[in-house]
Regions:
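Helix-biased detector of long, well-ordered alpha-helical tracts
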Residues: 1-239
Length: 239
């Protein structure tokens, strides 16, 4: 299954919960990657929101766990607002908690997205045996996320692809890489492929904060998918 929990709340709908976290990323003394806190929240929300959207859910609320400091809350919120603007969507209500009793020497942050999906609209286990596969965006991690952000698969493009009837499934890629998520997708859909290859991207590399997405689609629509994804489309070959 995906990195989400789906809880039935009626005969027709499921509650969807997705989460992400980061540690050692920020502006504190012992942080490994130095970035501002708007960026920390932006990418954290991007991961959790991606997980929610790609199973077909509508996000309803965001919960932030801020172990950075009280002053940073507004910066974290601003990072979330940046993503809302990018997606051209209404702001999602945000709540959460801040560690204000102790000063941390290393940044820690977690974020949860809560959404809802009609059971008939769940986009899981929808990939048929004749499907083709591609990666949207390149796998990046650590400092690469900032240095090569132009190579990240844009979330507005993913949102657009989710609306196309010839796109079967989209899976955000995390730290275990494209190959791992592809194998999971094949297992869920009972597909008999042995492996995938790519001459353009490293399919075993961590994709950090979901910098790329695995997509399954109708084989007759390769050109349409490539056009919609712009320069972010990378064909995956199956055996």
């Amino acid at each position: 299954m995906r990195d989400v929990i789906m809880i039935p709340i009626s005969n027709d709908e499921d509650l969807v919960i997705a989460a992400d976290n980061s540690g050692g990323v920020g502006q504190k003394m012992f942080d490994y990657v130095k970035v501002d806190y708007e960026t920390v929240a932006y990418y954290g929300l991007r991961v959790a929101l991606s997980e929610c959207l790609t199973v077909g859910a509508k996000p309803l609320a965001i919960v932030m766990q801020n172990l950075i400091g009280e002053e940073e809350w507004s910066h974290l919120q601003k990072g979330c607002q940046t993503l809302f603007s990018e997606l051209k969507c209404e702001p999602i209500p945000i709540t959460g908690s801040t560690e204000s009793n102790f000063k941390m020497v290393q940044s820690a942050f977690a974020i949860m997205v809560i959404g809802k999906v009609r059971k008939a609209d769940i986009k899981v286990r929808k990939t048929p045996s004749h499907a083709k596969f591609a990666c949207i965006g390149k796998p990046l991690c650590g400092g690469e996320v900032i240095e090569k952000k132009h190579e990240i698969g844009p979330l507005p493009i993913i949102k657009k692809l989710l609306e196309l009837p010839y796109v079967f499934e989209i899976v955000p890629i995390g730290s275990k890489g494209v190959q791992y998520e592809w194998k999971k997708l094949c297992e869920e859909n009972k597909l008999d492929y042995c492996q995938i290859t790519s001459t353009e991207i490293d399919i075993t590399k961590s994709a950090g904060p979901a910098t790329c997405f695995l997509i399954s689609f109708h084989p007759d629509r390769t050109e349409d998918i490539a056009k919609a994804a712009g320069g972010h489309f990378f064909q995956l070959n199956t055996k």
